[in-house]
Amino acid sequence: MRHYEIVLMIHTDQSDQISNIIEHYTKMIKINKGSIHRLEDWGRRQLAYPIKKLNKAHYILMNIETSTKVLNNIIQDLNLNNFIIRNMIMRVKNAINEPSPMKKTKENKELNN
């Protein structure tokens, strides 16, 4: 099995469905004996430029370990899902477990307030 990092940009109208979307992809991975090493909900963020006439999106980060077959199923599902504005999937050498820089800055801001 290989390690991948997935970033999803989800339409802001579906912010209340984020947990269902995460659960859907988590099930796809775990049913096929994959594992999730890191899962972060970055929340709503401003886009650098409008995409499909939207200025904000809800961001999700996942670091997973799964087979190529399951990854292809995930890619196909992402492309058919109208709520996913953009996605980025990168292959990484090792599992990443530590918090991302985005998560660290968000936690630091919460501690300072």
UniProtKB/Swiss-Prot annotation:
Question: Would you tell me the Gene Ontology cellular component terms?
Answer: cytosolic small ribosomal subunit
Q: Which UniProt keywords apply?
A: Ribonucleoprotein, Ribosomal protein, RNA-binding, rRNA-binding
Q: Which GO terms describe its biological process?
A: translation
Q: Which GO terms describe its molecular function?
A: small ribosomal subunit rRNA binding; structural constituent of ribosome
Q: Which domain of life is it from?
A: Bacteria
InterPro entries membership: Ribosomal_bS6, Ribosomal_bS6_CS, Ribosomal_bS6_sf, Ribosomal_S6_plastid/chlpt, Transl_elong_EF1B/ribsomal_bS6
Q: Which family does it belong to?
A: Belongs to the bacterial ribosomal protein bS6 family.
Annotated function: Binds together with bS18 to 16S ribosomal RNA.
For this entry, the protein name equals Small ribosomal subunit protein bS6
Q: Could you tell me which species this protein originates from? A: Wigglesworthia glossinidia brevipalpis
